């Protein structure tokens, strides 16, 4: 998961593959990650992200002049094609051309069609794009990709600890729209991200990731994950998903991730090991 950095939502500069970044965000680090995963015979999606200074939402990126848009497009293309070349050279299964860029996608449709063509000229694997759960229907180029990518932080429950039944019934409702959308484009839906924090009310606003001192609640996380899997995983229009998130150097003696998205050292970890073994 490489990262490029933007100083402001309206500034076209993109900074990536620099020594001051975390190794895992750079070309060298991503290559090492891919090698590690492939050695374990795991399929890999390479999914570039943008981080805007102060944590501003990438879906709100917007330039205020044509000149800046053109410059930003050139910078973004350079970023994406650099990692598309890496994905091809390492035979990565799936490449994601962008993550949660709603405003950029809607305001510059011609650029995205051109970018997809250029990526296809250098990368021969499957392609997707990751749009946020509430704006995935605004993407105009799904029929040019192999999967409809959704970062699936749908609101599921307002309960402190959602029951498995409650969360399952909510997914049974949500999945009807997803199924219809998949049928419209004759393309499978892929959850390019899904997951829940292990906190009270984890299903209320699953996208919230601020480092708050929320009370840990492993059962909430577990029930929400189980419900999603039970409702969706056997559907033929659904391609599966990528769980957010996993730390390579997890310290089981630390409470740092006790109320975070990671399942490591929690009830969900034992469940996921069994679930993935059967799927």
Give the predicted meaning of each segment.
Residues 16-21, 68-71, 98-105, 157-170, ...:
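Surface-exposed cleft-lining segments at the edges of enzyme active sites
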Residues 7-8, 80-99, 131-169, 187-188, ...:
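Aromatic- and acid-rich polysaccharide-binding/catalytic face
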Residues 150-165, 180-222, 244-260:
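Active-site clefts of carbohydrate-active enzymes
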Residues 43-53, 94-105, 113-137, 182, ...:
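Aromatic-lined carbohydrate-recognition surfaces of secreted/lumenal glycan-active proteins
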Residues 10-20, 202, 206-210, 222-227, ...:
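Aromatic-rich peripheral "rim/lid" segments of glycoside hydrolase catalytic domains that contact
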Residues 1-14, 25-105, 201, 246-249:
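Substrate-binding cleft and catalytic face of glycoside hydrolase catalytic domains
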Residues 28-39, 78, 82-85, 110-121, ...:
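Alpha-helical scaffolding segments of alpha/beta enzyme cores, especially the outer helices
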Residues 53-71, 145-147, 205, 209-210, ...:
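Aromatic- and acidic-residue-enriched segments that line the glycan-binding/catalytic groove
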């Amino acid at each position: 998961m490489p990262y490029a950095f933007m100083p402001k939502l309206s500034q076209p500069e993109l900074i990536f593959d620099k020594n001051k970044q975390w190794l895992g965000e750079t070309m060298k680090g991503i290559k090492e990650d891919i090698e590690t995963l492939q050695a374990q015979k795991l399929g890999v999606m390479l999914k570039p992200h943008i981080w805007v200074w102060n944590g501003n939402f990438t879906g709100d990126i917007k330039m205020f002049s044509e000149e800046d848009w053109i410059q930003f497009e050139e910078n973004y293309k350079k970023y994406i094609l650099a990692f598309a070349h890496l994905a091809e050279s390492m035979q990565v299964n799936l490449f994601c051309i962008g993550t949660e860029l709603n405003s950029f996608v809607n305001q510059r449709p011609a650029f995205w069609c051109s970018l997809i063509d250029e990526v296809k000229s250098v990368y021969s694997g499957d392609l997707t794009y990751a749009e946020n759960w509430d704006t995935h229907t605004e993407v105009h180029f799904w029929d040019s990709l192999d999967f409809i990518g959704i970062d699936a932080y749908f609101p599921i429950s307002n309960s402190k600890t959602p029951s498995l039944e409650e969360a399952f019934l909510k997914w049974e409702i949500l999945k009807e729209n997803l199924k219809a959308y998949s049928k419209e484009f004759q393309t499978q839906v892929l959850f390019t991200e899904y997951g829940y924090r292990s906190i009270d009310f984890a299903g209320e606003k699953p996208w919230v990731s601020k480092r708050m001192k929320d009370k840990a609640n492993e059962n909430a996380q577990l029930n929400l994950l189980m419900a999603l899997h039970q409702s969706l995983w056997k559907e033929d229009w659904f391609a599966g998903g990528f769980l957010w998130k996993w730390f390579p150097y997890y310290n089981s003696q630390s409470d740092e991730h006790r109320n975070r998205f990671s399942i490591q050292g929690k009830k969900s970890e034992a469940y996921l090991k069994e679930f993935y073994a059967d799927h």
